[in-house]
């Protein structure tokens, strides 16, 4: 029986029509209503169906879903060792044991562990699909179905590893001799079967009605989207420019529906990212919401804390992992902040270094947490059961259960319950042996597979639900953000190990079937009083068209000679005129000029006054990365130390050997992997530097001093007390007795030559010359160490004159700053590209 669309019919009236159709048919069949069964697509349909039958009066049939009725008729049999448990992470370990002895699996596991784990996940996914499909078969035909599936897969040998895995999955599912809980449905004998179809046929219900010996009625409520010229719903469409506009418009649409009395409102979770933002916006309004979709356990605070704990314990002693866990699990404190600052300042990367330090900030907390995770230390292979026991000990008093999602995390990981004796879960937990990395990966898989659904908020005015579960429910309006071609109408993905043709032949889910099911769910949404569709018009720089389902609806209207049913959504928020409020530019507060300026501070002031303001007046700086790869500046710092050690301790004899010895001394304590590229660069530099040094010394040049800390007071008047300071890499004397400033550089010679071409733009050497009193006989040069052609000295001509001009310019600029002159963001090019304050100055937002 077809239950199509009736103009003007609301959902409650529709359900009364269903109740009437059932009652009339049962009477015609002479079947007892109270002994009949009406199978509904989802548990959410039970309440409106009951209301409809109660309104009609008299006996009503048993209202159930196939799952709830099967559960009522008897428990599901327990999975025995070796059988499919339905728990994907546990079954992945069982599948590992299942194929571990096969030669191809051993080779894949050895050569590409990641590909092997992916193969296990696909095997489990396919085995679960076969098990579900088998449970939907008539028990008498199940054996024949398995044989037909096996024959189909073996007849076509194309597929290689994928086909082999699919056959293993099929054999695993077929070897399960348990009686599925759904078999009780085939033994049940009601007075009549009635099945309500919405969103496509239910294979189990079809098999049940086809194989029974009692009267059966199939109520088909599905709508043909291509024939829906005049939907019941008022369909509104909102076109949005970007993500935030989409989220705000969606929240406004929900609020407008509620203000108009259209409650409850279904917020369709088609695009979970957008809906998460919409939920946050609605929460600010204090609006109660019930989320039927939930989210993965891995995204809950409890899971984040647990994974941080495991990364700290099993991450090889990385300080970054330990700090991440401490900041999640401990109360914020100044001592903890000081500990992090210490680690970043000294680039401490290993937890063992902190263990050996005395008078550590937050030392009591550090030692207590290190001791707490001792049960997990080592990372050697253990049984999964032992890992879980040790994890439970490590958690100790950790208030995981008090965090959102904590109870679900503890249950999913078997930390708050025990597996049934003799079950598949107990066997896997006892037999599987994992190392620390394997256990960490398994916990991550469990949390990704688990779902966290918040507690039911009762009669909430907003219900967040998937499109398929919004069908035939008494919502006042539906709001669907993400009605674009990338999000709505594409369907889900098919099975990884089977082609579309194979899946279709075996009755397994296909992409085509999922697309059609989504189209049918969208068509059912057109029964609602109002359907508000919202979408972005662009994805980045690319145009983003409407969903093909919307296009099909518009085509159906045109085919029937009607106007498009889509109406423009009206944002009822009153526009607000915003008066520009210019903010004063940053300036130096009275007496807040730094007591001392370095060469880098002067460079910041000249490159961008706002950069100087943020770095040297506000004291802002980017936090050092603990686990960052060594940078070129780190190599430069190390090389400075090597050359200083070499020159200050140089003895007559082989310069190459002495320089290599200095490098070895400065390398002590460095991570070997980090030092390796430095060693290679240094070996290339070694002969070049020795050659340059010999040539320079042959001309009478000699090392005088290095790493020289200097300061001076070059200004007068109100700036007389301002100190200029810096560290000079090296000072040599020439054959004429002049002093020569040398600054080591590992950059390109071309860049250095470009710098000294405009001497007044070279701040660094001018500042160093001021530090050396800007004597007229002073010379200066950059020493380029990394040029393939050899070590090259790039001279800064007449550096004393440049220093004098720099001093005069700084005197003028600094006096203006003291008088309140603004410090605007005037930087350009590389000054902005590598600036830590970018974004703070808001220059990127200037229009």
Predicted regions mapped to residue ranges:
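Intrinsic disorder/low-complexity segments
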Residues: 172-175, 185, 206-208, 217, ...
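Anion-coordinating catalytic cores for phosphoryl-, nucleotidyl-, and glycosidic chemistry
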Residues: 2-66, 70, 74-83, 224-789, ...
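Basic/charged alpha-beta structural segments of nucleotide/phosphate-handling enzymes
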Residues: 40-189, 199, 203, 337-367
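Hydrophobic alpha-helical segments, especially transmembrane helices
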Residues: 162-164, 168, 193, 731, ...
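Conserved RecA-like helicase ATPase core segment
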Residues: 190-241
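Residue-level detector of anion-binding/catalytic polar loops
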Residues: 142, 215, 288
């Amino acid at each position: 029986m077809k239950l199509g669309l009736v103009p003007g019919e609301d959902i409650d009236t529709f359900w009364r029509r269903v109740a009437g159709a059932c009652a009339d048919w049962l009477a015609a069949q002479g079947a007892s209503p109270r002994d009949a069964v009406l199978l509904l697509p989802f548990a959410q349909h039970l309440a409106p169906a009951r209301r409809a039958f109660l309104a009609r009066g008299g006996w009503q049939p048993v209202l159930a879903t196939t799952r709830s009725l099967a559960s009522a008729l008897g428990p599901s049999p327990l999975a025995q060792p070796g059988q499919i448990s339905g728990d994907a992470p546990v079954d992945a370990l069982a599948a590992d044991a299942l194929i571990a002895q096969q030669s191809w699996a051993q080779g894949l596991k050895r050569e590409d562990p990641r590909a092997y784990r992916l193969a296990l996940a696909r095997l489990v996914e396919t085995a679960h699909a076969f098990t579900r499909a088998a449970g939907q078969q008539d028990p008498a035909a199940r054996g024949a179905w398995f044989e037909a599936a096996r024959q189909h897969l073996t007849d076509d040998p194309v597929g290689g590893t994928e086909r082999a895995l699919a056959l293993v999955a099929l054999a695993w599912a077929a070897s399960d001799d348990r009686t599925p809980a759904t078999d009780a449905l085939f033994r049940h004998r009601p007075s009549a079967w009635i099945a309500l179809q919405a969103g496509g046929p239910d294979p189990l219900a079809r098999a049940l009605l086809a194989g029974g010996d009692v009267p059966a009625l199939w109520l088909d409520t599905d709508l043909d989207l291509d024939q829906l010229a005049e939907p019941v719903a008022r369909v509104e469409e909102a076109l949005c420019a970007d993500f935030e506009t989409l989220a705000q418009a969606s929240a406004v649409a929900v609020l407008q529906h509620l203000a108009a009395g259209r409650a409850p409102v279904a917020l369709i979770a088609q695009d979970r990212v957008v809906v998460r933002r919409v939920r946050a916006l609605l929460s600010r309004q204090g609006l109660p919401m019930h989320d039927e979709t939930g989210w993965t356990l891995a995204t809950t605070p409890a899971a984040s804390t647990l994974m941080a704990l495991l990364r700290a314990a099993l991450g090889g002693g990385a300080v970054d992992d330990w700090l991440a866990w401490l900041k999640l699990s401990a109360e914020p404190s100044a001592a903890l902040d000081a500990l992090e600052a210490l680690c970043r300042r000294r680039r401490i990367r290993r937890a063992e270094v902190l263990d050996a330090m005395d008078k550590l900030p937050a030392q009591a907390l550090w030692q207590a947490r290190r001791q707490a995770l001792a049960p997990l230390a080592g990372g050697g292979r253990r049984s999964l059961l032992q890992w879980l026991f040790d994890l439970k000990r490590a958690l100790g008093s950790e208030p995981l259960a008090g965090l959102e999602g904590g109870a679900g995390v503890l249950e999913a990981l078997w930390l708050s319950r025990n597996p049934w004796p003799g079950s598949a879960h107990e066997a896997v937990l006892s037999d599987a042996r994992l190392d620390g990395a394997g256990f960490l990966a398994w916990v991550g898989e469990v949390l990704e597979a688990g779902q966290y659904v918040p507690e039911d908020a009762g009669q909430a005015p907003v219900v967040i639900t998937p499109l398929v579960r919004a069908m035939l429910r008494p919502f006042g309006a539906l709001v669907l953000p993400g009605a674009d071609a990338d999000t709505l109408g594409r369907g889900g993905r098919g099975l990884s190990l089977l082609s579309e043709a194979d899946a279709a032949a075996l009755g397994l889910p296909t992409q085509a079937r999922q697309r059609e099911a989504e189209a049918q769910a969208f068509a059912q949404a057109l029964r609602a009083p109002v359907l508000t569709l919202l979408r972005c018009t662009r994805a980045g720089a690319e145009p983003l068209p409407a969903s093909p389902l919307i296009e099909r609806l518009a085509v159906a209207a045109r085919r029937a000679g009607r106007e498009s049913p889509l109406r423009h959504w009206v944002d009822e928020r009153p526009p607000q005129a915003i008066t520009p409020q210019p903010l004063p530019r940053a300036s130096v507060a009275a007496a807040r000029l730094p007591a001392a300026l370095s060469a880098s501070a002067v460079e910041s002031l000249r490159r961008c006054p706002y950069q100087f303001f943020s770095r040297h007046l506000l004291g802002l700086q980017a936090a050092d990365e603990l686990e960052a790869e060594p940078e070129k500046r780190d190599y430069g710092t190390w090389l400075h130390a090597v050359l200083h050690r070499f020159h200050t301790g140089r003895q007559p004899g082989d310069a190459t050997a002495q320089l290599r010895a200095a490098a070895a001394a400065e390398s002590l304590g460095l991570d070997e992997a980090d030092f390796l590229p430095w060693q290679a660069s240094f070996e290339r530099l070694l002969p070049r530097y020795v050659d340059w040094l010999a040539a320079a010394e042959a001309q009478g040049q000699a090392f005088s001093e290095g790493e020289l800390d200097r300061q001076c007071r070059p200004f007068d008047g109100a700036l007389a007390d301002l100190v200029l300071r810096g560290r000079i890499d090296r000072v040599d004397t020439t054959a004429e007795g002049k002093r020569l400033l040398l600054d080591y550089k590992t950059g390109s010679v071309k860049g250095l030559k470009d710098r000294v071409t405009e001497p007044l733009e070279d701040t660094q050497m001018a500042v160093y010359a001021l530090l050396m009193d800007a004597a007229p006989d002073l010379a200066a040069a950059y020493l380029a160490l990394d040029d393939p052609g050899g070590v090259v000295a790039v001279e800064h001509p007449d550096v004393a004159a440049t220093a004098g001009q720099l001093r005069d310019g700084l005197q003028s600029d600094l006096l203006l700053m003291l008088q309140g002159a603004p410090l605007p963001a005037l930087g350009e090019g590389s000054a902005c590209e590598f600036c830590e304050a970018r974004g703070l100055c808001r220059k990127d937002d200037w229009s």
